[in-house]
């Protein structure tokens, strides 16, 4: 089996090294990742300039583009490697709730899913760098189960690993997406020339961390698995919308 691996933190990140190392014990691996951190770019494509594919000394390939670009490159240019699965991550920081709309990590998996390839996004609910041992141990558990009976149809799973010691991981829970409050996150500043500039600041606080959500269960020490879908149609609103637009 062949697994294409990407991320949004870049090919030099600790998370992608862990993901590639563990996955290589179960399958053939090829890494195609952005050359630098592309967090928050979602499913964007690079359309205004050409892309370059290069190979690093560690064997990883990197692209001067987005995670979505990397999936297209990875599936298009290698005659000797066609992915059976796509793994994205391990992201340095959670991708839960609304985060999934912005995440390049989730976007790489989403793009693969749109191509008909089963895909999984992995994230660690920590940005301090203290819990990579937990992430690696969790990954061994997850992939041993995954490859024992691999999914046969396209799936899109979002997995978050808790920020606890390896021995304190409480198991795996299937969870729905939670929600964040919208952050007031535009921060004004001045550049060295005195010109007005703006920074996009931190995300908002979590507003839905109830039991059964990814925020709630991962915060309680569980690995969370959330099945995602691409169809954004609000089916319960179809009749009401039709009544509005078809009214005399």
Curated annotation (Swiss-Prot):
Keywords: Cytoplasm, Hydrolase, Metal-binding, Nucleotide-binding. Its EC number is 3.1.3.5. Disulfide bonds: none annotated. The keyword Cytoplasm applies. Its cofactor is a divalent metal cation. It catalyses: a ribonucleoside 5'-phosphate + H2O = a ribonucleoside + phosphate. It is found in: Cytoplasm. Its main location: cytoplasm. A divalent metal cation binds at residues 8-9, 39, 91. GO terms for cellular component: cytoplasm. Pfam families: SurE (PF01975). SUPFAM superfamilies: SurE-like. GO terms for molecular function: 3'-nucleotidase activity; 5'-nucleotidase activity; exopolyphosphatase activity; metal ion binding; nucleotide binding. It comes from the Bacteria. HAMAP family: SurE. Nucleotidase that shows phosphatase activity on nucleoside 5'-monophosphates. Belongs to the SurE nucleotidase family. This is 5'-nucleotidase SurE. It comes from Neisseria meningitidis serogroup B (strain ATCC BAA-335 / MC58). The gene is surE.
């Amino acid at each position: 089996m062949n697994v294409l691996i990407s991320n949004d933190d870049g090919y030099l990140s600790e998370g992608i090294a862990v993901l590639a190392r563990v996955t290589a014990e179960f399958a053939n691996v090829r890494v195609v990742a952005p050359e630098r951190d592309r967090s928050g770019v979602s499913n964007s494509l690079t359309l205004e300039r050409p892309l370059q594919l290069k190979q690093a000394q560690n064997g990883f390939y990197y692209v001067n583009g987005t995670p979505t670009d990397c999936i297209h490159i990875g599936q298009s240019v290698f005659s000797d490697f066609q992915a059976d699965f796509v793994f994205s991550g391990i992201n340095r920081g959670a991708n839960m709730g609304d985060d999934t709309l912005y995440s390049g990590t989730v976007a790489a998996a989403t793009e693969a899913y749109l191509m008909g390839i089963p895909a999984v996004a992995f994230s660690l609910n920590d940005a301090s760098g203290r819990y990579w041992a937990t992430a690696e141990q969790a990954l061994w558990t997850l992939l041993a189960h995954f490859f024992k009976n691999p999914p046969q149809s396209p799936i899109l799973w979002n997995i978050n690993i808790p920020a606890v010691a390896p021995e304190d991981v409480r198991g795996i829970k299937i969870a729905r997406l939670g929600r964040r409050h919208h952050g007031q996150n535009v921060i004004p500043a001045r550049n060295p020339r005195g010109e007005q500039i703006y920074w996009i600041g931190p995300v908002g606080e979590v507003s839905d961390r109830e039991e059964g959500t990814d925020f709630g269960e991962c915060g309680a020490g569980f690995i969370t698995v959330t099945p995602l879908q691409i169809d954004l149609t609000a089916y319960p609103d179809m009749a009401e919308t039709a009544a509005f637009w078809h009214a005399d």
